[in-house]
Amino acid sequence: LSVEPRPAFYALGGGGWRDYVTLLHPPYTLWHLSYVVIGAALAPSLPVERLAWGLVAFALALGVGAHALDELNGRPLRTSIPNGVLAVTAGVSIGGAAVIGLVAAFAWTAWLLPFVAFGSFIVVAYNLELVGGRFHSDSWFALAWGAFPVLTGYVGATGTLRPEAILAAAFAASLSLAQRHLSTQVRDVRRRATRISGQVVYKDGREEAVVAETFTRAPEAALRAMACAVVALAATLLALHV
């Protein structure tokens, strides 16, 4: 008897409230919220209130809104959350994040305005695969989910851009690109593969059957470790301001 694999290693089965937890993609949401912390923590003096509001905005737009749109667009997580609930959740979350960004721009620095505009656009364009999926690519993921949170966190904290922020954004973009490459293979196996077969024969005569875990075990272990590493790095930089 074959058992259908979970759509993601962090997916909870059973429906109900578990679907809403799964929808948040917990390890990835923490990962990308950590980029906001990293950006803000590069500031000479960390304005805690600005960081807190930045985290709330990204938690709404990325953690909730983006993932609700993604689930609305093809049900990759196979949740039972109604379409209407997903649509309203996405609209309220992304709209709330945009309002926070606009208020912050007028209260702190106008340099946040282009970041609010870009974030509001890319969260919809990427997850709904608008313009024929042109924005749903590895490079756009690296920029939007990696570099963008770092730069926004830094600009929100300082009102300017400096070389250290650009370098940190390059770090986040590169790491997010690695995340994308690893997770793409895992998603293909978990969500699209209907049959996997084969055998690995080693030089010493050992034989090993090729199963789904052959393609998911190592990438998922790497993704878990990378998520923990980014969160730890963000916490370390934050601790420097305590």
Q: What are these model-derived regions, one by one?
A:
Residues 128-140:
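Membrane-helix interface "capping/anchor" motifs
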Residues 1-80, 85-123, 143-242:
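Hydrophobic alpha-helical transmembrane segments
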